Amino acid sequence: GEKAHLIFPVDKFKANTPDGKALIDAYDRLVLLEQQFMGLEKYDRMDPNHVCFSVMYNDSYMYSAANHTGYVASTMNMMCDISQFIQSIWGPAHEVGHSNQTKPGLCWHGMGEVTNNIHSLYVQTSFGNPSRLLDLYNGKTYTIYEKGLSAFFTQRRPHVVKDDKVDELNQLIPFWQLYLYTKAMGNEDFYKDLYELVRTRSDKATPGESQLEFTVLACEAAQLDLTKFFT
């Protein structure tokens, strides 16, 4: 493809991929959506390299490495079937999101499995899927959204604290709310501009300083006073 390179078993392509062009176009779109979300296109920073999606024969389900994203052999039917791929696109988008994480400004300590999911959710919904935050929380009667909002607003739990009551998907909610709110306010470029600020400003020395700097840069990118949101 133009942006993606697939290394999957030939027999899986033969069994699941009647239209190879349509499949690679979907992978290309995944990669492009994440690059656009980060402002790489807006700020003329597009990566000329392809993102490699490769089958792996080990115990890892899916992962992101230095030069590829890997997917266990048991996922190959899904990865080669365009309908299944689009419905399950969270996983590949999550791994590409890891490759795109910008440290430490948007990936300070404790956010390794959180901020990449801003990308996952953006890609998931851009492909027309329902938001994963609307799924029921671990089979309960309430959604991930409801669980997180209860933890942060009713119980007033610190965002950084993760335990059996709050997980990475709950921690994703405030980041996604920033996207939804700024978009509703007419700012389509919030995260594009935020990523550029992170890329061009000096890194902070500690995770705590990085977290505080994020609030400052978010206000700057949104061109709004978001103090109440962060307190």
Briefly describe each language-model feature range:
Residues 143-231:
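Active-site-proximal alpha-helical
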